[in-house]
Each structure stands twice: as structure tokens, then as C-alpha cells.
Amino acid sequence: MKHIRNFSIIAHIDHGKSTLSDRIIQICGGLTEREMAAQVLDSMDLERERGITIKAQSVTLDYKSQDGQTYQLNFIDTPGHVDFSYEVSRSLAACEGALLVVDAGQGVEAQTLANCYTALDMNLEVVPVLNKIDLPAADPDRVAQEIEDIVGIDATDAVRCSAKTGVGVPDILDRLVRDIPPPEGSPDAPLQALIIDSWFDNYLGVVSLVRIKNGTMRKGDKIKVMSTGQVYNADRLGIFTPKQIDRDVLNCGEVGWLVCAIKDILGAPVGDTLTLARQPAEKALPGFKKVKPQVYAGLFPISSDDYEAFRDALGKLSLNDASLFYEPESSTALGFGFRCGFLGLLHMEIIQERLEREYDLELITTAPTVVYEVETTAKETIYVDSPSKLPPLNNIQELREPIAECHMLMPQEYLGNVITLCIEKRGVQTNMVYHGNQVALTYEIPMAEVVLDFFDRLKSTSRGYASLDYGFKRFQTSDMVRVDVLINNERVDALALITHRDNSQYRGREFVEKMKELIPRQQFDIAIQAAIGNHIIARATVKQLRKNVLAKCYGGDVSRKKKLLQKQKDGKKRMKQVGNVELPQEAFLAILHVGKDSK
């Protein structure tokens, strides 16, 4: 036990977590030179393409330290994006310490702070590391001072390293062994194992990543899931050295994987406790608090035959991603599908891409909305996560929208731009602190504005230097309206959006113009209208295609021409009564981007 160290690597996006993990694996000889690849832990092809970490990965390595002892390091590489902060908090629950990696060129950023506070709340030992000292722009002394000012950890003797070149990485390992405490727990107590993560393997069924807090787990043990009381047989267990290695026993304090031939995806929920059937533990370990989705969107398969496959795919994915929420929903325009809850827009994009890639589905997404709290005239409080569920205007007493508290960090020269952006997003400033050249801003901004495109716009106004961390604060009364879209005088439920009354005129007009470009011209005029209740606020017309019926008349009587034109007109009129308009997939996607390019 004394020789086990469990730690996570936390940092802001692109500060070099995954590269540092590569170096640590290399130094400890987890993989041979031939098997080594850049960012070896980012195993999903989506992660490699976007160059970001999405899933936390765990690795067990043996490290010979300078005092001649061999230590077992269990470490978890975590994502840096604000949308995946739930992954980070789960990983931290399995550790006794964390490496806080900070880019020596860029300094402290918002996510660094957020993740670091999460670690400190869980009473973990935080070891600061200054990375990327090989860059010409690196200024480790200034950044060490910044860590002290902003985060409040003593960073004067922080390890300086360059994960890319490998300089200083052995020092990190020695510092780890010295500063991070060994796991507590007794090997003789009844087994308590925390499920940190689960995923579905087509051959093995459910594979769970567990951290043994007390007791030991052996191959062939009868294992009981504490929340459901079901008993399974531990068929295989082992560790990752990034490769899956089978072992016969997992000892107290270790992190490893377990296969119990669970077929049902709800068999081993993340955050649950496993114990032995013959001598169960008294009580379950404190799990993780369930995370509430911030953004909801409808996902619909393009062909309705895929509905079953789509349902299974969502089930398997939600096992792997505990923060995904879904329930069935049907729409007149799009058929059957699911209403899904996500932690943010990036999370939504990633889930959609994973469904399309890993499960070969073709999906349509409706515009994302946040959850509104509605008090009806009958004094009931209901939560609305989709525009179609909003009660009629005359039944609403008041509508409250969620407000997010946003913490932003940026260099001073971009302060003006960022404040302008926040005000445009209906934000209210609550705090502003200067730390040397950095400014920390706190704003309360409506969640609907944050999830739409705030992050992208923040990055572009500050040339990528500003960083953001946000969380739900409270519900607040506000004047929100539902804008419906009518095509040929028919409401299309999938296109409705909820927006603030001040922006409604503008959003409606822009929306209609955009739709006009996207709907292909038909044989008759198509009217596209945006309406609040029965009040039309914007309209555009897609002009019809028409054949030149007069081409065959050379000269001749005007009444002949009139007759032909009249006949064409009548034909178009008849078509318009029976014709319906097919909406292309681009039309739905364009709605997500309304307001992004135009401002």
C-alpha cells in the first residue's frame, strides 16, 4: 500500500496533459518504443482529429524512484474542456493527488482554476507543474507568481518541464512520490470498490473501471452491486498499462478494470459501489453528485427504420458518458426520436458525431434550448426543456430563465472587447479583479446566451486568450417569448425557438432570411413566416420556378397569351393547395448558427 500513488492530471485545454502522460508512460516503460504514439491515451478517433481529450483514461505504471524503491503509479488523464468537467470530477474522486499542469507561456486560465478548486474541495494534494518551458515565449517565473496570486498554491518550487522534449519529467515523478500521500483503507476490511467509469464492449459486455477503496477483489469472486443488490461473477479483472492486462487480484488502493458479463447497460451505474456477496460492506461509498444537463436538443434518425438501433446506441453511449440524459420524443415534422440533455454545445456535437460514427446512424438535431422554469396561472411550476412543451401565452403567470455564473480570465488588453460581448449577451457584471497583467471577470449571463455561441465569440474577440468556466446559478424572471416558424401557413414544431422579446424581432427576421436561402425553389411560391402567438413578425417568400408558356407564340393575338398565362396561374394555385415542402437537413443545422456569422 505504501508504494501506491493515485493521481490525475488536470489542466486547461491545450496545456499539454496528454503529451505529459505520453512521457510518463515512456519513462516508466509502459509501452515499447514501437507501440508509442503521440497522445497514446486519446484512443477515440474523434479525440485524435480534434486534438482534444474527451474521455478520462487510466494507466497503471511501475516507477523505480531514485531511492531505489519501486512505486506503482495509477494515473488518470482528464479532459480540459468545460463541457467535460464531470469526467474530471469523477477521475479526481479516485485519486489522492493531482498534477496541475500550467503552460509556462500562457499562464493560468479559467479551467485551470475550476479544476484546481474541484481538487482542493476533495482534499487532494495539488502539485503544480510548469510545462512547455522549451517555448521561446515561456516565462516560468511570471507564471509561478500568477499561480500563487490567482490559484493560491505555493508554486515557487514548482517543477519545470517540457513534456514535448522530455526535460524535467523525471523530476515530476520524484515530486509525485514525495508529495502525494499513499491511499488509505484496509486490505482486510469488506470490499468497497467505486465505479469510476463504464463502457460497453461488444464481446465482453459492460467493462467497468474501479478504484478499490477497502478490501481486495479476486477473479471468480461473487460481486454485488450495492444500489441494485444484484450479484455477478467477476470473470476477468486487470489493469491498463495502456494495454489491457489480465490479473488475478486487485489490491486495496489500486485502480483497475473489471468484467462481470453484465449484459444490461444499467447493471453497473457510474458512481456505484461494488462489494462481495458473502461479506458485504456496511454502507456504500459516497458517489458523485448527479450532474444536471444544461442544454437540451431533439435528436431524430433521418429514416424512421433506424429508431430501434438509435435507442440501443444511446443506451450504450450513456453508459460510457454518465452525463448524457435522454427520453423519447415525437415531432410531427421529424417523426420519432429522443430529447437529449447535454452539458454544453461541444458535448452535444461530440455525442452526435460519436453516434454517427460508432453506430452508423444519420441524425437530425433540432435547435438547442435550455431549461426554463414556468409558473402557470394555475400556480403550478413546470420545467420546460423544449419550445413545443411551452404552455400557451395566456396560461403563463411568469417565465424564469436559467442564469449562469461565468468566470473569465484574460489579458488586460482584451478587457474592453470581452465586456462589450458580455453586455450584448445581456450579462451583468458581479466582480472584476486584476492579477498583474491578467484580469478575472465574473458575469451573470443567461444560460441560453452562453450555450449558443458565447465560447466561440469569446475566443474570437480575445484572439484566443480569454478562457471561460461557467456553472448554473439560479432561475430569474425574464421576458421570454416563443417564436414559431410557419412554412406555407403550417407551423413546423421542430423549428420553434424561445428567445428574449428584445431580440425576437431580429432573430425572427434573420431566421426567415436564412431559411429563404436554404429551401429549394418549388413550382409555387412558399411563404416563410416567423410568429409570436398569432402575431407575424417577419416574412420572406421563396419565388416559384415558372416555365415560359409564351415561348411557342410568335406574334399572334394577345388574348391567346392571356389564356396561356391564366391557365398557368390556375395550375400553380391548385399545386399550392396540395403541395407540401420538403425541408433539407441544412435548414435545421442553419438554425443552430443563427446569430453566429451575422454580428
Curated annotation (Swiss-Prot):
Q: Does the keyword Lipid metabolism apply?
A: no
- Enzyme nomenclature, EC number: 3.6.5.n1
Source organism superkingdom? Bacteria
Q: What is its main location?
A: membrane
**Reaction catalysed?**
GTP + H2O = GDP + phosphate + H(+)
Give GO terms for biological process. Answer: positive regulation of translation
Gene3D superfamilies attached to this UniProt entry = 3.30.70.240, Elongation factor 4, C-terminal domain, Elongation Factor G (Translational Gtpase), domain 3, P-loop containing nucleotide triphosphate hydrolases, Translation factors
Q: Which GO terms describe its cellular component?
A: plasma membrane
Give a Pfam family name: LepA_C
| Similarity-based family | Belongs to the TRAFAC class translation factor GTPase superfamily. Classic translation factor GTPase family. LepA subfamily.
NCBIfam families hit by this protein: lepA, small_GTP
Q: What does this protein do?
A: Required for accurate and efficient protein synthesis under certain stress conditions. May act as a fidelity factor of the translation reaction, by catalyzing a one-codon backward translocation of tRNAs on improperly translocated ribosomes. Back-translocation proceeds from a post-translocation (POST) complex to a pre-translocation (PRE) complex, thus giving elongation factor G a second chance to translocate the tRNAs correctly. Binds to ribosomes in a GTP-dependent manner.
Name listed for the protein in its UniProt record:
Elongation factor 4
Origin organism is Pectobacterium atrosepticum (strain SCRI 1043 / ATCC BAA-672)
